[in-house]
């Protein structure tokens, strides 16, 4: 009887254990970015909306320019933005912006839209155009280790 209970218990536990182990294994194989998009998808989106492909050279120039104000994108994100930066007024740490140096960069559409809106308003005192976003992202995607 004990042997029968052990066997039945093993059969009952085994599927649950298998599901648990399977879920754990699947979680371990997920990529580091957990968002709903990628840098390449964002570039494609903005290029399509702008009606022109992103231009990395124009993106680099835009990223480093002050646009008549006190700050540029590089004021906080660094030049080039491949290491952690620091917010110019708050001192808060900012993760590397270039996707090759930060797998989570440009992986969440809502987060991307929110921060482009805020940061463009800080630097330009207006929202960035889709062409400007595409150019900056083309520049950032081109930065490699």
Q: Which residues are covered by each model-predicted region?
A:
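C-terminal capping alpha-helices of c-type cytochrome domains
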Residues: 113-145
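N-terminal secretory signal peptides that target proteins for export/translocation
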Residues: 1-12
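The canonical Cys-X-X-Cys-His
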Residues: 68-80, 136
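Bacterial N-terminal signal peptides
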Residues: 15-27
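N-terminal signal peptide c-region/cleavage motif recognized by signal peptidases
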Residues: 29-31
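Short cysteine/histidine-rich zinc-coordinating motifs and their immediately flanking basic loops
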Residues: 85-92
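Electrostatic cytochrome c docking/interface patches
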Residues: 35-67
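Short microdomains enriched in Cys/His and/or Lys/Arg
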Residues: 94-110
């Amino acid at each position: 009887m004990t042997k029968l209970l052990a066997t039945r218990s093993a059969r009952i536990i085994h599927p649950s254990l298998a599901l648990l182990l399977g879920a754990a294994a699947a979680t371990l194989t997920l990529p580091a970015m957990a968002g709903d998009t990628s840098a390449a998808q964002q570039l494609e989106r903005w290029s399509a909306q702008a009606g022109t492909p992103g231009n990395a050279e124009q993106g680099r120039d835009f990223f480093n320019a002050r646009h008549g104000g006190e700050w540029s994108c590089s004021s906080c994100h660094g030049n080039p933005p491949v290491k952690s930066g620091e917010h110019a007024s708050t001192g808060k740490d900012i993760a590397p912006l270039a996707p090759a140096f930060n797998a989570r960069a440009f992986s969440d559409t809502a987060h991307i839209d929110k921060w482009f809106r805020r940061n463009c308003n800080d630097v330009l005192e207006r929202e960035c155009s889709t062409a400007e976003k595409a150019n900056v992202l083309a520049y950032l995607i081109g930065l490699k280790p």
